[in-house]
Amino acid sequence: MAHIHNDDFEMAKSDPQALFAFRGTPRKVLFNPGDRLFRFTSQPQGTFRGNEIFSSPWWHAQSTFNAIVRTANATGNSVADAARSGLAVSPNWNPTMEWLVIIELTKPVYGWVGPARHQPVKDGDRSALFLGNADQAYVPGLATGGNGMSSPFANIYYYGSMMGV
């Protein structure tokens, strides 16, 4: 049987900040070829260098994207605002969230999925929080052997602007 990417990865021994990004303990999930993973990104601007595509381990599944769109429609907020709140993404990490990246897996990979932990709207000020609670996926090492725009485990399926959506 072929080795599955991240099969030997131990989330409990990973970066403590990654574990802290989840509300509770994330569950190990097998993503199969043909599965699509999503993430919102920001382009470089000022001192922000932009979000990398495959180098970042943070993604979410189609079901989370669908829930974000439903929330945006129900509240009248933009998809980016609904995503920022549900995924608890600080503007310091991703200032605009105006671009959507969808990748399609070409090989099976393991990831860890669970609800996003709340995060402060502004660093150091816990008086206002992004609530989180939307399922996020931590899938490390997708860029192994590739670069920021390619991966031996996935192809870019879609990369486009979310401005005005």
Language-model-detected regions and their locations in the chain:
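N-terminal low-complexity, Pro/Thr/Ser-rich intrinsically disordered segments
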Residues: 1-23
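Catalytic toxin/effector domains delivered as secreted proteins or via bacterial secretion systems
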Residues: 16-164
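Short amphipathic alpha-helical segments
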Residues: 1-8, 157-165
